[in-house]
A protein has these predicted regions:
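A membrane-topology feature that recognizes alpha-helical transmembrane segments
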Residues: 1-261
Length: 261
């Protein structure tokens, strides 16, 4: 019975992963992610029902589009598998007894699934385009508010702590919209700050601090490796160019998931 439950959760996670790849591709292009059918990005042919099974479709089709025979990037398969494994890992770590499932545990798991969706989409878009998209941040704050309401009503949590987070979120959002919208660098930093607030709401201060620490270490290693690469290849890449290649949102997402696990 347990094996069947874990397989089902893995498949649900893989389906989420399939949706994440769609969202990562469409959100920066301002395309609809809910009503428009999936299509091949190479030939634009709409995909059939049997073309969209997570993992299986990729394997059966040999990593190619059924219609134009162009290769499909392996990131689709990788993200679906990773998503499935992470969903299973979270279920296992929460120690949910499948023979005595409690509503509170199911609610917590659902909130965690929504939160992981936020991280995956942020990471995917940032890795591809180095952007923290506002629609994704808006989604993050919406699920945060719902989660706060749940904690305060059901678990009688201290609401003042979360109110402080929301106040900071609104202040940064106002600054980003009014004062700093002309500066791409500041806009990106503000997006990172808003992302950190959502992380803190869902995972608490301790995990957030560890996430920031591990991300800082990762960024430092990245910069050091780039400097060494510059010296070896005698590259003229400036610090400004290194900054432009630095995907902090991606690193934050990855380190936060690893810290949770």
């Amino acid at each position: 019975m347990e094996t069947i439950i874990y397989i089902i959760i893995f498949l649900i996670g893989a389906m989420f992963g399939s949706f994440f790849t769609l969202a990562v591709y469409r959100i920066p292009r301002r395309e609809d992610i809910t009503h428009t059918r999936s299509y091949c990005p190479k030939c634009n042919h709409k995909l059939g029902f049997f073309d969209m099974f997570p993992i299986l479709s990729y394997i059966i089709l040999g990593g190619k589009c059924r219609y134009c025979k162009e290769k499909i990037r392996p990131r689709y398969l990788i993200l679906e598998i990773l998503s499935g494994l992470i969903f299973v890992s979270i279920f296992y770590l929460m120690k949910i007894d499948i023979y005595n499932i409690k509503i509170e545990q199911v609610a917590e798991y659902c909130f965690m699934a929504l939160y992981l969706s936020f991280l995956f989409i942020i990471a995917g878009i940032d890795k591809e385009q180095r952007k923290i998209e506002k629609p994704v941040l808006t989604y993050g704050i919406i699920i945060s508010i719902i989660y706060i309401a749940y904690l305060c009503i059901v678990e009688k949590a201290n609401i003042y702590r979360y109110v402080i987070y929301l106040v900071f979120y609104v202040l940064i959002l106002i600054l980003d919209t009014i004062s700093l919208k002309k500066y791409a660098k500041s806009k990106y930093i503000n997006g990172i700050l808003l992302m950190i607030i959502v992380i803190a709401i869902f995972t608490g201060e301790y995990v957030t601090i560890n996430t920031i620490a591990f991300t800082s270490l990762t960024v430092a290693i990245y910069i050091l490796l780039n400097k060494l690469k510059q010296r070896r290849n005698k590259s003229l890449k400036t610090d400004k160019q290194i900054w432009k290649d630095l995907k902090i949102g991606f690193y934050l997402s990855i380190t936060n998931v690893l810290t949770i696990l």
